[in-house]
Amino acid sequence: MGTRFLLALCLVLLVLGFEVQGAQLSQQDEPPSPALLTQVQESLSSYWESAKAAAQKLYQKTYLPAVDEKLRDLYSKSTAAMSTYTGIFTDQVLSVLKGEE
Protein backbone atom coordinates (compact mmCIF):
# COMPACT_ATOMS: atom_id res chain seq x y z
CA MET A 1 0.00 0.00 0.00
CA GLY A 2 1.16 3.46 -0.77
CA THR A 3 1.77 6.11 1.83
CA ARG A 4 -0.89 8.31 0.25
CA PHE A 5 -3.49 5.58 0.72
CA LEU A 6 -2.51 5.13 4.38
CA LEU A 7 -2.57 8.88 4.95
CA ALA A 8 -6.02 9.18 3.36
CA LEU A 9 -7.28 6.23 5.41
CA CYS A 10 -5.97 7.77 8.65
CA LEU A 11 -7.61 11.10 7.82
CA VAL A 12 -10.95 9.44 7.08
CA LEU A 13 -10.80 7.47 10.34
CA LEU A 14 -9.86 10.62 12.25
CA VAL A 15 -12.79 12.57 10.79
CA LEU A 16 -15.19 9.71 11.54
CA GLY A 17 -13.89 9.54 15.11
CA PHE A 18 -14.50 13.24 15.65
CA GLU A 19 -17.99 12.89 14.13
CA VAL A 20 -18.87 10.13 16.57
CA GLN A 21 -17.53 12.10 19.55
CA GLY A 22 -19.42 15.22 18.44
CA ALA A 23 -22.66 13.27 18.04
CA GLN A 24 -22.29 11.80 21.53
CA LEU A 25 -21.67 15.22 23.08
CA SER A 26 -24.67 16.81 21.36
CA GLN A 27 -26.91 13.94 22.50
CA GLN A 28 -25.78 14.37 26.10
CA ASP A 29 -26.74 18.07 26.11
CA GLU A 30 -30.33 17.41 25.03
CA PRO A 31 -32.93 16.38 27.61
CA PRO A 32 -33.81 12.72 27.40
CA SER A 33 -36.72 12.02 25.07
CA PRO A 34 -38.42 8.76 24.16
CA ALA A 35 -36.52 6.81 21.58
CA LEU A 36 -37.71 6.81 18.02
CA LEU A 37 -38.29 3.07 18.16
CA THR A 38 -40.54 3.48 21.19
CA GLN A 39 -42.58 6.15 19.42
CA VAL A 40 -42.94 3.97 16.33
CA GLN A 41 -43.97 0.98 18.45
CA GLU A 42 -46.59 3.02 20.28
CA SER A 43 -47.94 4.42 17.02
CA LEU A 44 -48.16 0.99 15.39
CA SER A 45 -49.74 -0.43 18.52
CA SER A 46 -52.45 2.24 18.53
CA TYR A 47 -53.15 1.67 14.82
CA TRP A 48 -53.33 -2.08 15.41
CA GLU A 49 -55.73 -1.67 18.32
CA SER A 50 -58.02 0.64 16.34
CA ALA A 51 -58.01 -1.72 13.34
CA LYS A 52 -58.73 -4.66 15.61
CA ALA A 53 -61.63 -2.82 17.26
CA ALA A 54 -63.07 -1.86 13.86
CA ALA A 55 -62.81 -5.46 12.63
CA GLN A 56 -64.48 -6.72 15.81
CA LYS A 57 -67.37 -4.26 15.36
CA LEU A 58 -67.77 -5.25 11.71
CA TYR A 59 -67.75 -8.94 12.63
CA GLN A 60 -70.39 -8.42 15.31
CA LYS A 61 -72.61 -6.47 12.89
CA THR A 62 -72.45 -9.10 10.16
CA TYR A 63 -72.37 -12.25 12.30
CA LEU A 64 -74.36 -15.11 10.78
CA PRO A 65 -74.26 -18.49 12.56
CA ALA A 66 -74.60 -20.49 9.33
CA VAL A 67 -71.69 -18.68 7.70
CA ASP A 68 -69.62 -19.05 10.85
CA GLU A 69 -70.25 -22.80 10.88
CA LYS A 70 -69.29 -23.09 7.20
CA LEU A 71 -66.09 -21.13 7.79
CA ARG A 72 -65.12 -23.34 10.71
CA ASP A 73 -65.79 -26.47 8.64
CA LEU A 74 -63.79 -25.08 5.72
CA TYR A 75 -60.91 -24.22 8.04
CA SER A 76 -60.80 -27.69 9.59
CA LYS A 77 -60.89 -29.41 6.18
CA SER A 78 -58.22 -27.17 4.70
CA THR A 79 -55.87 -27.60 7.66
CA ALA A 80 -56.31 -31.38 7.46
CA ALA A 81 -55.47 -31.32 3.75
CA MET A 82 -52.48 -29.06 4.30
CA SER A 83 -51.08 -31.29 7.02
CA THR A 84 -51.43 -34.30 4.69
CA TYR A 85 -49.69 -32.55 1.79
CA THR A 86 -47.02 -31.18 4.10
CA GLY A 87 -46.28 -34.71 5.30
CA ILE A 88 -46.03 -35.97 1.71
CA PHE A 89 -43.75 -33.08 0.74
CA THR A 90 -41.53 -33.67 3.78
CA ASP A 91 -41.21 -37.36 2.92
CA GLN A 92 -40.27 -36.50 -0.67
CA VAL A 93 -37.63 -33.97 0.41
CA LEU A 94 -36.13 -36.40 2.90
CA SER A 95 -35.98 -39.18 0.30
CA VAL A 96 -34.26 -36.85 -2.17
CA LEU A 97 -31.75 -35.69 0.43
CA LYS A 98 -31.13 -39.17 1.75
CA GLY A 99 -30.73 -40.71 -1.69
CA GLU A 100 -30.92 -44.37 -2.56
CA GLU A 101 -29.43 -46.79 -0.10
Swiss-Prot record:
Residues 1-22 form the signal peptide. Disulfide bonds: none annotated. It is found in: Secreted. Proapolipoprotein C-II is synthesized as a sialic acid containing glycoprotein which is subsequently desialylated prior to its proteolytic processing. Proapolipoprotein C-II, the major form found in plasma undergoes proteolytic cleavage of its N-terminal hexapeptide to generate apolipoprotein C-II, which occurs as the minor form in plasma. One of its GO terms (biological process) is lipid transport. InterPro entries: Apo-CII, ApoC-II_dom_sf. Keywords: Chylomicron, Glycoprotein, HDL, LDL, Lipid degradation, Lipid metabolism, Lipid transport, Secreted, Sialic acid, Signal, Transport, VLDL. GO terms for cellular component: chylomicron; high-density lipoprotein particle; low-density lipoprotein particle; very-low-density lipoprotein particle. It holds the Pfam family Apo-CII. Its main location: secreted. Component of chylomicrons, very low-density lipoproteins (VLDL), low-density lipoproteins (LDL), and high-density lipoproteins (HDL) in plasma. Plays an important role in lipoprotein metabolism as an activator of lipoprotein lipase. Both proapolipoprotein C-II and apolipoprotein C-II can activate lipoprotein lipase. PANTHER family: APOLIPOPROTEIN C-II. This is Apolipoprotein C-II.
